[in-house]
Design a protein with these regions (language model features):
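ATP-dependent carboxylate/acyl-activation modules
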Residues: 1-187, 192-254
Length: 254
């Protein structure tokens, strides 16, 4: 989806078995690969869902260790989410890790870019402990994204020269994706500066507004029920709103 909107990403392939993971690594070539558990949650790296490996044998071992298991992160339910597939991509040389996201500010009715030079980390913790590291630029829907918005973000992230142009292209692609795909959140963490000075999205998360799924047929076809809470899924099929919580104490308020 990112590639469709002109946002550079590492080349890679999805694999459902360790053998497919090995085949993916060989097709990509190189000397370093990253094996990523495909679950609908952030925080995979800290939970062991992202492995950097330097041999095809280790690609197979990493995939075998993930597939069929459940991954538990701060963003999953207590029992974690099943790992049915892994993504094998070419390793990238990372000079800097940045953060970039796009969401709606419901208070102002504007679309907000949130960025930080502290990428690759828990952004909520960064915002709580060092709010000065968070950059916010809001875009009025009537005027749309302007070059000044992009430059303010790029300079705030410490980008220079050609990197600013690359970033503007990424920001414009992100903004277009956000609008056309009816997103409630698009997050890149990390957005990296590569060894040759390029800018690339290394990992991402996209949330689609559920009330708009009726006009997002292609994205709806990608939905994976195994990554959803079963009770929430059943309630949704009955057109009911239900939020699954841990524990056995509840409060009903009218």
């Amino acid at each position: 989806l990112f590639a469709r909107y002109g946002i550079p990403v590492p080349a890679g392939h999805v694999a459902s078995t360790p053998e497919e993971a090995v085949d993916a690594a060989r097709r990509r070539g190189g000397a370093v690969w990253v094996v990523k558990a495909q679950v609908h949650a952030g925080g995979r790296g800290k939970a062991g869902g992202v492995k950097v490996v330097k041999s095809v044998a280790d690609v197979k071992s990493a995939a075998a260790g993930m597939l069929g298991q459940r991954l538990k992160t701060k963003q999953t339910v207590a029992e974690g989410l099943p790992i049915n597939q892994v993504y094998v991509e070419t390793g990238s040389k990372i000079e800097r890790e940045l953060y970039l996201s796009l969401l709606l500010n419901r208070d102002t009715g504007r679309i907000a870019f949130v960025a930080s030079q502290a990428g690759g980390m828990d952004i909520e913790a960064v915002a709580a402990k060092t709010p000065g590291k968070i950059i916010r630029v809001e875009v009025h829907p009537a005027t749309g994204l302007q070059g000044s918005h992009c430059r303010a973000l790029a300079f705030g992230l410490g980008l220079k020269g050609e990197q600013v142009k690359q970033f503007e292209s990424i920001a414009r692609g992100l903004y277009k994706l956000y609008l056309e795909c009816d997103c409630s959140l698009v997050e890149i963490n990390p957005l990296i500066v590569t060894g040759d000075g390029g800018v690339m999205a290394l990992d991402a998360k996209i949330n689609i507004e559920e009330n708009a799924l009726f006009r997002q047929k292609e994205l709806l076809a990608w939905r994976d029920p195994s990554q959803e809470d079963e009770m929430e899924r059943i309630a949704g099929e009955a057109d009911l709103n239900y939020v699954s919580l841990d524990g056995d104490i509840a409060c009903m308020v009218n």
